[in-house]
Amino acid sequence: MEECIKRKHIQDSFNAQIKLVNNRIPNGHIREHCIANLGQINMIGRDRCQQVRIERPTANGTALALYTVVDVHDQEPDIVFLDKNEDDLRKRLELEHSNVADFTGKVNAQVTAVGLTDAETEYSNEFIENLADNGHNRGLIVIAPHGGNIEKYTDEQAEHVGQKLSSEYVSQWICKGFKKGGGAFDRWHITSTDISEDSFPKLKTVMRRHFEYSVAFHGWRHESICIGGTIPDDVKDQIRTAIVDVVSDPRIEVNTDYEHKCPEDFNGNSKVNIVNRLSANGLQIEQCEKTRKYHGIDIADAVADVIGRLIKM
């Protein structure tokens, strides 16, 4: 993040030659990563570490997905490199296995749609960010970076915590993404350690607030729940106890990251994870879809009860 530099931009997008390559994108979440020319992305107001939309024309309209610019190159300005993984390209940009080849597309600086209601966002297959904040709260911020149909029900959980606790002490930052027929995750997901506030204008307004606590609701495919983040372990234990009490399925394990039972990529401990950048006491909760669907609000209640007691009121 510290490598990112603010520069004035003079346009919002550029036509690009998308080159598909092997073994060039740095390790990590390469399906969401791209490499671009620094001067060219600066022209659209973006920089290294920030997000862009990459669009590809199709017979039925436009295929698009969000990408993070993880590195830059000094070749022709309009060249953008993506990893040549056929499954990822099919899911993200609708490239069929028989037609995985370089293409001409567009790189757009706009990440979130502006001025849409939640219903309009769903109807338009779009992606928005919502912020509920009184301008001075420093107690708690609850977030769902992957709401809508990206990681279903997580936005409802974050909204419920905000409704249950006093708005004077709780802020909410929630993103919602949709795609008819499925595929919202492939189109709109940006991993939490990559999220740049420079690509999310509403998030940027609260990034330097230094909240006392932050909570992030997430979904994953593992049939369990992981409680992680930088919040003290004794608070994680309280959260686990509260969640176990409301999740009635004994087959769903509720683990904490310090027990080393959570996959490293999902333990929420990274300092650049957005939940930990918002507060030194960041709490990340990863949940399988079954618990989100049938116990999501109960889990949100449990989290609100524990964190609510800790906020300085």
Description of each model-found segment:
Residues E2-K8, D12, E94, K106-M313:
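N-terminal catalytic or cofactor-binding beta/alpha core of small enzyme domains
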Residues A59-G61:
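Terminal interaction modules at protein C-ends
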Residues A65-H73:
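Basic-flanked hydrophobic alpha-helices used for secretion and membrane insertion
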Residues Q11, K19-V52, V72-F103:
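Short beta-strand-centered segments at strand-helix junctions
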Residues R53-P57:
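A generic structural signal for residues embedded in beta-strands
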